[in-house]
């Protein structure tokens, strides 16, 4: 993929940030990796039913599974062949707003189930996740106006969601094993 630079009104634009076709291999890898991790996590959660007894464990399980599923769906949306910049922009903008609203609702449900002493720390740990989620509608808006980064906004989302989901999955499996020993 060639990096094409274009000068527009004193700024340098990177055309590939606005063309989904140039990202096919990347999003194919994201979809494949996320789908594989989702399957592994689903099996691990099925084998460790003790996890769903605790509100924090349920919250982590939901975050890990939903984060990976969101990455699969996000990748599939970008991989739709022949899709123009504007339709993709609208899909990301609307989908990202809906995603954030539902995410906040589910996190509020988790927080209310936690002991009050653990709530501030839980809410604080969610800041990177929600900032990464807000990058999805930012990518959509950027595609719609044709400036400010386009699909590059999704890179932090993908990195944060992969790291977040993998870390949560690991913590769940390790904590479940520790609790079974006790």
Language model features with spans:
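Terminal transmembrane helical module of multi-pass membrane proteins
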Residues: 136-182
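Juxtamembrane helix-loop boundaries in multi-pass membrane proteins
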Residues: 15, 22-32, 52-73, 115-133, ...
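Hydrophobic alpha-helical transmembrane segments in multi-pass integral membrane proteins
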Residues: 72-81, 131-147
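N-terminal signal-anchor/start-transfer transmembrane helix
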Residues: 31-49
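Alpha-helical transmembrane segments
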Residues: 22-35, 86-100, 153-162
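Short, strongly hydrophobic alpha-helical membrane anchors
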Residues: 1-25
């Amino acid at each position: 993929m060639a990096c094409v630079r274009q000068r527009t009104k004193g700024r340098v634009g990177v055309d590939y940030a606005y063309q989904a076709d140039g990202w096919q291999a990347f999003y194919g890898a994201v979809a494949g990796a996320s789908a594989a991790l989702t399957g592994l996590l689903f099996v691990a959660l099925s084998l460790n039913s003790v996890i769903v007894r605790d509100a924090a464990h349920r919250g982590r399980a939901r975050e890990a599974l939903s984060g990976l599923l969101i990455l699969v769906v996000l990748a599939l949306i970008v991989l739709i062949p022949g899709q123009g910049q504007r339709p993709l922009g609208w899909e990301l903008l609307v989908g990202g707003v809906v995603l954030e609203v539902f995410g906040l609702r589910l996190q509020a449900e988790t927080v209310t189930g936690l002991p009050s002493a653990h709530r501030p720390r839980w809410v604080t740990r969610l800041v990177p996740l929600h900032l990464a989620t807000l990058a999805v509608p930012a990518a959509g808006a950027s595609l719609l106006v044709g400036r400010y980064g386009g699909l590059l906004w999704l890179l932090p989302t993908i990195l944060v969601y992969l790291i977040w989901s993998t870390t949560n999955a690991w913590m769940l499996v390790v904590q479940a094993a520790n609790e079974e020993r006790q």
